[in-house]
UniProtKB/Swiss-Prot annotation:
Functional summary from the UniProt entry: Binds to the 23S rRNA.
Family the UniProt entry places it in: Belongs to the bacterial ribosomal protein bL9 family.
Membrane-spanning segments: none
PANTHER family assigned to the protein according to its UniProt record, in alphabetical order: 50S RIBOSOMAL PROTEIN L9
Protein name: Large ribosomal subunit protein bL9
Entry-linked InterPro entries: Ribosomal_bL9, Ribosomal_bL9/RNase_H1_N, Ribosomal_bL9_bac/chp, Ribosomal_bL9_C, Ribosomal_bL9_C_sf, Ribosomal_bL9_N, Ribosomal_bL9_N_sf
NCBIfam families xref list: L9
GO biological process, one term: translation
Protein species of origin: Corynebacterium efficiens (strain DSM 44549 / YS-314 / AJ 12310 / JCM 11189 / NBRC 100395)
Assigned keywords, A-Z: Ribonucleoprotein, Ribosomal protein, RNA-binding, rRNA-binding
Gene that produces this protein: rplI
């Protein structure tokens, strides 16, 4: 049975792939769950159009990611204000949310907190630090910030 996948299926393919599967697997699992549609000439043309649109969107996303990377690398004066003890140690640690808010406050681009890669030894004292921000697949930017007492 020839099917077009509408979602990623483990050990079979990703959305848009045309696959050949056994009749029972297609009828009893893939089609009822909406993971695939029958491969008709009209559906194949429709999938080709969707793939072209996805490729164009991926190119736009990549261009946008490069712009965000340039903005982040040019950004200066990012300060994370946190409560500290007299010795300069933080009550807790700096989290990804804090960094994202500080970047936004410094005039930088909006980032997703999941894009920030915090070091294994958490930021627990005042000073200057640097973390990575995974903006897009294959595009990583360094975010420099300073932790100051609030």
């Amino acid at each position: 049975m020839k099917l077009i996948l509408t979602a990623a299926v483990e050990n079979l393919g990703v959305a848009g792939d045309i696959v050949e599967v056994k009749d029972g697997y297609g009828r009893n699992l893939l089609l009822p769950r909406g993971l695939a549609i029958p491969a008709t000439p009209g559906a194949e043309k429709q999938i080709e159009g969707i793939k072209r649109a996805q490729e164009a969107r991926a190119i736009r996303d990549l261009d946008h990611a490069r712009e965000v990377k340039a903005q982040l690398e040019a950004l200066e004066g990012v300060k994370v204000a946190v409560r500290t003890s007299e010795s300069g140690k933080l009550f807790g640690s700096v989290k990804a949310d804090d960094i994202v808010d500080a970047v936004k406050a410094a005039g930088g681009p909006n980032l997703d907190k999941r894009a920030i890669v915090l070091p294994k030894n958490l930021v627990k004292t005042t000073g200057k630090y640097q973390v990575e921000a995974k903006i897009h697949e294959g595009i990583v930017s360094r975010v420099k910030f300073e932790v100051v007492a609030a």
